[in-house]
Amino acid sequence: MTLTRRDLIKAQAAATAAAAAGLPVSALAQPVTGGAEALRIRWSKAPCRFCGTGCGVMVGTRDGQVVATHGDTQAEVNRGLNCVKGYFLSKIMYGEDRLTTPLLRMKDGVYHKEGEFAPVSWDEAFDVMAAQAKRVLKEKGPKAVGMFGSGQWTIWEGYAASKLMRAGFRSNNLDPNARHCMASAATAFMRTFGMDEPMGCYDDFEAADAFVLWGSNMAEMHPILWSRLTDRRLSHEHVRVAVLSTFTHRSMDLADTPIIFRPGTDLAILNYIAHHIISTGRVNRDFVDRHTNFALGATDIGYGLRPEHQLQLAAKGAADAGAMTPTDFETFAALVSEYTLEKAAEISGVEPALLEELAELYADPDRKVMSLWTMGFNQHVRGVWANHMVYNLHLLTGKISEPGNSPFSLTGQPSACGTAREVGTFAHRLPADMVVTNPEHRAHAEEIWKLPAGLLPDWVGAHAVEQDRKLHDGEINFYWVQVNNNMQAAPNIDQETYPGYRNPENFIVVSDAYPTVTGRCADLVLPAAMWVEKEGAYGNAERRTHFWHQLVEAPGEARSDLWQLMEFSKRFTTDEVWPEEILSAAPAYRGKTLFEVLFANGSVDRFPASDVNPDHANHEAALFGFYPQKGLFEEYAAFGRGHGHDLAPFDTYHEVRGLRWPVVEGEETRWRYREGFDPYVKPGEGLRFYGKPDGRAVILGVPYEPPAESPDEEFGFWLVTGRVLEHWHSGSMTLRVPELYKAFPGAVCFMHPEDARSRGLNRGSEVRVISRRGEIRTRLETRGRNRMPRGVVFVPWFDASQLINKVTLDANDPISRQTDFKKCAVKIEAV
């Protein structure tokens, strides 16, 4: 409906009253920007499409098109602010080259691996796709099919994909691109606390006395949260900010303690801080004795490379990289005592005075500390260790699970938490922190999903890098990519990724809204609906689940990923994909389609299409005859309710600006594990890390170990990759926004001016960035936002014309299997 002036006055009055009472504010009760003209625009709430901050926006539609967006003034996360990408959200869906019909490689009228792309109908696309999947399943079985998903999937899209892969095709070869960004954080949360995701929330920004950024350029990558941090720093004189990075960036402008360290040496710095806390007598012994256990981690664990690589062959602890051996405080203290101030300074290249200043922020018992990190920590061959080490500091001092004391892992995708982690679309996970290797967890999933006992596979599937290797080696032959641009985002793409996509044994499907590098390497491209062209839900970094309605129609024949997954499932019967022993034991399932078993199962289809808000369209409900988003969400929510992952009823989320789980009796949780905030902590317990059977968190002792590859005489520079403010990930959306394209049209190589001069190069010189794996051409930048130390260069990865991941190394953390995009050796040569 369109807002009239009377509607607007009533809505704003309601908003004022609700805000005064501390109540959630409805989506209608919003100030409307733009004057009288805006009153002819229909406004609805949604979370932003970009990063994991989870900003709320108001989306304005008119005549079936998104015509404007503005920051949602009632959203707690951003309070009406947008970053530059959020400001241009209304343009991301309207690039001239939107995909509007399926495209199949064809020659002489039939599918051919070496054919040219030609438009086909959805029926023809699914016919060929199903035939290829059935061929592979029949010839090689479930381990030869795979899927690569996304932290940009909506919650129900990821959930439907997990059901189709695990229960339908009986394959755990399902992984999200969040493997490249959040796996180390998730793994360390589980190992330390027994549950995933931060215990704190964004309210910590208004309560902390110190902020320490570890490998996080928040000023560009999380600018809205940076604005909250900046406000706290500038309005309270006692607040301090420390920023640690391998080069100087915009977040350094606010730093009281700016620290530039050698790549990979943050591990030594972290152990030094732990030693400083212990040696100066600032351990909170009461907290440590009551709430923690100590362990030692396996060492010399390798670098996640192919088994035949010399570094893997030499690694003595690679066979059990995640092993943890119980120990005591004294043994832990002895380990970190080796990391004296002098040794940490020598390893890291940081001035001792700065390290001591940093350590005091954590050691001071009267100072509340919020640690913040993202890719610099997680994209690290010892990323799990780095995450553990920062938890060590908070646990040793008791600075955790209360306002202002918060180790906080930031996320880069809008639902890396809500979908990849909470739904469990990793190769080893099920919903609500359950895992495929646990027979009780599998049985629980089979019960909720109404499946025959013993159906779900017990083996851990291939992770992201391993999927590329298995495609390369012909071990995965049917592969579906949704909502990611893996051919641009994966490491070492020339040697590992591209050969797998073009392997003649393999059939590659890509679902996307725009042509991408990945799509150009596929055999079948399916046009996808974007953002508010479908009803959706995301979960952000502070455990906030946020819904939106479908507001416009997708162009042409583009369809949501949810529709694609559900519709494709109709092409298979249980007799074609399940083993005979399962069907013999459960004959009632014979002859049923996977759609009937997984989606028309009396649970997902129990809500009629008439439940859809009559003011909004729902393409999937109209086609399937029931409300699949509601059914999938309520079925999924059953995994977590009563188990510390409680979600509110489906309809509640359409009325509020998101709620932070666990949501118990209508109340969200801001700080987990702490009495008075968390309903799962009983009166008198004070604090309990209830993810662990004994309620205790783990303090892990591990050493500094060097990166997989370092500069040498031939390859004399460290290469760091990452993002810039104006573009998001591979640029497939932001490069199609004219204003963002003009602001930063192409990638450059940031270099120290003295390094350039010593090679006879200048700002703007065309150069080759060369590694042992590949090379690109780009131009030098010796000024501007990123100021490099000698011997380090930075190249962003958003530019498809400069595929910097031809150069990167496919080393990954042996525990989390997250890729290290921050450290490899390159040489720079003039063209």
From Swiss-Prot:
Q: Which cofactor does it need?
A: [4Fe-4S] cluster; Mo-bis(molybdopterin guanine dinucleotide)
Its GO CC terms are: membrane; nitrate reductase complex; periplasmic space
- Which reactions does this protein catalyse? 2 Fe(II)-[cytochrome] + nitrate + 2 H(+) = 2 Fe(III)-[cytochrome] + nitrite + H2O
Which one of the record's GO molecular function terms can you name?
4 iron, 4 sulfur cluster binding
Q: Which residues bind substrate?
A: 797
Processing after translation:
Predicted to be exported by the Tat system. The position of the signal peptide cleavage has not been experimentally proven.
**Places the protein is found:** Periplasm
The family database entries (PROSITE patterns) matched by this protein are listed as:
4FE4S_MOW_BIS_MGD (PS51669), MOLYBDOPTERIN_PROK_1 (PS00551), TAT (PS51318)
Question: Residues that bind Mo-bis(molybdopterin guanine dinucleotide), according to the entry?
Answer: 85, 152, 177, 181, 214-221, 245-249, 264-266, 375, 379, 485, 511-512, 534, 561, 721-730, 805, 822
**What EC number(s) does this enzyme carry?**
1.9.6.1
Which SMART domains did the record assign?
Molybdop_Fe4S4
Annotated coiled-coil segments of the chain: none
Q: Which residues form the 4Fe-4S Mo/W bis-MGD-type domain?
A: 41-97
**Cofactor note text:** Binds 1 [4Fe-4S] cluster. Binds 1 molybdenum-bis(molybdopterin guanine dinucleotide) (Mo-bis-MGD) cofactor per subunit.
Q: Which UniProt keywords apply?
A: 4Fe-4S, Electron transport, Iron, Iron-sulfur, Metal-binding, Molybdenum, Nitrate assimilation, Oxidoreductase, Periplasm, Plasmid, Signal, Transport
What does the record say about induction? Nitrate reductase activity can be induced by nitrate and not repressed by ammonium or oxygen.
Q: Say which family it is in.
A: Belongs to the prokaryotic molybdopterin-containing oxidoreductase family. NasA/NapA/NarB subfamily.
Q: Subunit structure of this entry?
A: Component of the periplasmic nitrate reductase NapAB complex composed of NapA and NapB.
Physiological role: Catalytic subunit of the periplasmic nitrate reductase complex NapAB. Receives electrons from NapB and catalyzes the reduction of nitrate to nitrite.
Q: Which PANTHER family match?
A: PERIPLASMIC NITRATE REDUCTASE (PTHR43105:SF11), RESPIRATORY NITRATE REDUCTASE (PTHR43105)
Q: What is this protein called?
A: Periplasmic nitrate reductase
Origin organism is: Cereibacter sphaeroides (strain ATCC 17023 / DSM 158 / JCM 6121 / CCUG 31486 / LMG 2827 / NBRC 12203 / NCIMB 8253 / ATH 2.4.1.) (Rhodobacter sphaeroides)
Q: What is the lineage of its organism?
A: Bacteria, Pseudomonadati, Pseudomonadota, Alphaproteobacteria, Rhodobacterales
